[in-house]
Amino acid sequence: MATILAHITIRAGKEPEFEAIAQTLHPASHATEPHLRAYGYWRGSEPRTYYTLLAFDSFLDFINHQTSDHHEIASPQLGGCIEAMRLEWVDPIQGASTLPPTRSQEAPADADELTAKYAQRFAAQIADWWPARP
């Protein structure tokens, strides 16, 4: 499982463009990614702040999302809108969430170059204080 909370700050004046991209990515992701558990966007209380919650059956399913055609097409557009972004790996509390624990995975040995690159760039960060993974 992989669950991420993205903290996003948008460049001033780019909010409408960012929201339009999100409105394209959301349905495309839900329609084409069978291992997607949760994916949504929220406006924060501070101007230009947004949050995205992403949850997948596995870390490699998250990487498949990142390397999907619709995400790769949107990435340059997103880059023009995003001023800053921090990915926070979060761990669902068992018994208080329907999502399983966040786990890290390595890319398969036969992974294509983009998948291997993204698996390293976005490697899951498992906090020391989280319960041990079975």
What is the role of each PLM region?
Residues 2-9, 38-68, 88-89, 100-108:
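Short, well-ordered beta-strand segments in beta-rich or mixed alpha/beta enzyme
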Residues 9-20:
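Short, surface-exposed ligand-recognition loops at beta-strand->loop->(often short) alpha-helix junctions
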Residues 13, 47, 73:
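Short alpha-helical
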Residues 93-98:
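A short acidic, often aromatic-flanked loop/helix-cap motif at beta-alpha or helix-coil junctions
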Residues 108-111, 125:
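Surface-exposed beta-loop interaction hotspot
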